[in-house]
Structure formats: structure tokens, C-alpha cells
Amino acid sequence: MNAMQRLNRIVKEKGPLIAGLDPDFDKIKQVWITQNEELVADGKLEGDPEKNRTIMGTFCQDYIEAVKESVGVIKINSAFFEAMQMEDLYWNIAMNAQMEGLYVIGDLKRADIGNTSMEYAKAYLDATSPFDAITVNPYFGTDGIKPFLDLAKKNDKGIFVLAKTSNQSSAEI
């Protein structure tokens, strides 16, 4: 079953809604501190990468648990993990979402010149990747998108090409 067939099956079963996971650590941290005082009892949080990883990982897992019965698709934004230097956690969260039966979209917004796009594509669209699909940016034209498309076809994955995004100034370009 290819990516589009999987997506169509999931939409028929659970509907067209997608849960977006954009874990803004500063917002999460405030709620977390009040609910998990034992993890921050020493008052340290800012400079403690292990506590931050625990907070981020637990929040994301709780989010997946909360949405998995209501939606069949989750779009996980990589930027929030990259900013915290937690790319490995990003992959773990994607794998966990996949194991829960969700169709996993890597919200990467990647593209570049052809050979660089191919390297991005290899990273996220490999046959063993937990991502069913990823988002790509069309700014580089077909040179930037074709490597993603070719590898997605080869490995039964998908791509979503950004068109009109939801941010306020998106109509400017």
C-alpha cells in the first residue's frame, strides 16, 4: 500500500483532521512545572538538557495519547526539536506515533538545490523512516522538489508541497 492509499484509508476511518504537534518548549515548561514539581524541585530547568528532554518527550507522548483516537494523521514540526538540539527525540516521537497507527507527516519544509534536496530526501524518505510523508518548500522549483518526489515514489512515501501557508504574511510572495 503506498502513501496515498494509506492516507485515504485513514481518512475514511477517522476523518480528514490532522493533529499538529508544534511543541513550543517555553509554553510547555510553564504547565509542566506546575504539574511535575518533583522534576523541578531543585529549581533548575533552563540549563538541564536531560530534564528538558524528559519534559519534551513526555509532553509529546501525552499529546499522541490524547489525539490518537480522534485523528489518524499527525504532523510533527521539526523546528521545535532542532532548536533544542533534540533531533533524535524527533525521530523517536515519530516512531512512537507510527507504532500507534498514525500516519506521520514530518513537518520539515525542506528543499534546496538538487543534490542537497536529495540528501534531505534520503534522510527522511528512506524506506525505514517512520515518516509516511514530509512537507517540502517549492521555492527552488522542480530542481528542489524532484529528488523528494523520486525517493517518495521509490519508497512508498509522500510529500506535501507548501502552497498557501497559514501565516499572516504568506500572501506577500
Please describe what each predicted stretch is.
Residues 112-173:
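Conserved anion-binding
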Residues 82, 103-117:
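Conserved PLP phosphate-binding loop immediately N-terminal to the Schiff-base lysine helix
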Residues 43, 92-105, 127-133, 159, ...:
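Short, Lys/Arg-enriched charge-dense amphipathic segments
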Residues 1-76, 81-91, 98-103:
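Conserved N-terminal beta1-alpha1 strand-loop-helix module at the mouth
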Residues 89-93, 147-148:
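A short acidic, amphipathic alpha-helical/loop segment
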Residues 21, 75-76, 104-108, 133-136, ...:
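General beta-strand structural signal in soluble alpha/beta enzymes
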